[in-house]
């Protein structure tokens, strides 16, 4: 009986995690496709323009990722409570807020770009091409931020297949549209940007169609005045405010890591960038299980099922520990060969030997932070998640500035690994208390 229960719980986790992992892997493909297309146009300025423009949108959309996470946690709890009215309101509330933020971005697009180019130094040609790319792609903000709401809502509804279908569709549309505009109409960077824009709206409208077809029964429960009910909106913004500041800390640490590496020279920057690809690859897998944590933790909290909640957390950590060990072994055996696929610059490959062992520690140091983030989002324990991020971020900068004069780039990696580990340690300490309080308050 116990084996059957464990098998059933593992199936629930994998049913959400595997499609989420596939979705995560497709995300960088949009940017990679754009770079590949312009990389054959005959000038490095095109690649630089896509790199700069892509970085701007990555930062902007990363900051507003709370729309997906907050919606996922609250929807999964409503799902566990079988509260169809609140489930319906949460989707419209999230998409509505996303569209409002997108409208603000459209209004402020000129000062945003001006500020960006005061912080980023590029050649005049790259700046001109990046400006073209930005002013086209910014019109995809409503689709992108609206889709964040849908993605979080689908996951909260225990359905990660729809976000996967949407992500795959976006990539196919982007490839076809961008190639057509660039090579048939000779639109160059403008063609790539237009292809990306069309792909974004294709994904958004596909989400609407999936909702209308498979969740049509919920449309009968729409009461517009209840969507902006004061108490519900307060909770919505309270949860998302904490996630926003948590994400801001994440962005600051990530950008500082790149900046600190760049300050130590081109070779160190290149080495750090390559080694971080090992972390990025691992994060795609762990994020899939974090999404499962969001959906299932919220569901069981909504259903007031503390036994199932505890069982899910245990199973998530079994998966996390097992996968971390596998990644550590794989990186130890073939990590350097993987780096060789990313670059043929022998000076960079040789320099990476000095810092490679830091990358080996990443999976074991970081897996618990990913999983607890998912559980905390499902529990809407976002204030505690923010506290853990603040502690970890402060430690990151403290360790770096304390040891950099002695250790150089090793201090940067030491600080990053302590930052990852502390997030997991603090959340582990808070996790049990939070679970009990959340269940008791339901």
Language-model features, listed with the residues they occupy:
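Membrane-helix boundary and inter-helical linker elements of multi-pass secondary transporters
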Residues: 40-43, 77, 156, 185, ...
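Transmembrane alpha-helix boundary and packing residues in multipass membrane permease domains
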Residues: 20, 24, 36, 73, ...
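Short alpha-helical transmembrane segments in multi-pass integral membrane proteins
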Residues: 1-17, 75-142, 182-241, 297-362, ...
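Helix-terminus/linker motif at the lipid-water interface of multi-pass membrane proteins
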Residues: 29-48, 117-124, 180-187, 248-281, ...
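Small-residue-rich hydrophobic transmembrane alpha-helices
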Residues: 47-107, 144-162, 271-333, 367-380, ...
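Short runs within selected transmembrane alpha-helices of multi-pass transporters and secretion channels
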Residues: 136-155, 163-174, 192-208, 287-290, ...
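N-terminal transmembrane alpha-helices
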Residues: 5-41, 55-70, 74, 99-106, ...
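Transmembrane helical elements of multi-pass membrane transporters/channels
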Residues: 15-34, 136, 169-170, 199-203, ...
